[in-house]
């Protein structure tokens, strides 16, 4: 009878049976990644990997022409302003809907502060260590804030991957914190680590505020506001706190252009990913930035990479694999049960 056939689930056997899907199609449907997995993959490939180049390239620009951090940040903000064109063509308000315009501007401000702290820290702290502290603090703060404000918990595998990535970061940066030089140089280095930590805190707050924004053009609006707020805040600060420098060599201009493009790609991908997956997991996957920065730190900047750095980077990569594999396996299980 039709009711006993495994492909039928109709109460009346007189109804026509639905056509069965080919085995290959059913297999593809079962193995289709979930939204969370898609978000984590976008954060890994489009957010973490390009961002890993930003710190070393910023340091190269500083070493080549003493380019101030605020000037580099201003150049990066300029790459966000052309986003106003597609917003205008679609008829969307540049600053967002009036009822949530304040939150959108606050989200952009938090992102500007986070990037500003990161750029300042990388001038006095090795690029890999600065990225390590910033990403570690953003992960911890995101987990705590999301748990307290959104009551969104994590599974055991997620916590395992999250804590493993934080352990890897501690292994990377821990020995350097215990060997800070005494005197003025040691103070500057310590302040660099503090700035990196504050940058991670601002990043986690910015991600949570961004998740609370719900309107169609949310991502391009926040990206445009990032450029606008950055220019309004840091152009005066550049002339007050630092001395503007006009790069005269091709290397500096190339680094500035690459930083602007890669940072814009990373910003967009992270904004997409955080709407699909838990903010703490997104921040944990973004730890791939640290691994890329360490590789460039050794091969391009010719700075020392200790065995602790290699060990910590391996643990970070393993933790990212656990988080991604767990989300993919959950989606497969859910499709099979259906």
From Swiss-Prot:
Region of interest (Disordered), ranges: 1-21
Pfam short name (any one): EamA
GO CC entries: membrane
The keyword Zinc is assigned to this record: no
Alphabetically ordered keywords of this record: Membrane, Repeat, Transmembrane, Transmembrane helix
Domain EamA: 49-174, 272-325
Protein origin, superkingdom: Eukaryota
Main location: membrane
Membrane topology (UniProt): Multi-pass membrane protein
Family the entry assigns: Belongs to the SLC35G solute transporter family.
Note: The gene encoding this protein appears to have arisen by SVA-mediated retrotransposition of the SLC35G6 gene in the primate lineage.
PANTHER family in the record: ACYL-MALONYL CONDENSING ENZYME-RELATED, SOLUTE CARRIER FAMILY 35 MEMBER G5-RELATED
UniProt protein name: Solute carrier family 35 member G5
Record organism: Pan paniscus (Pygmy chimpanzee)
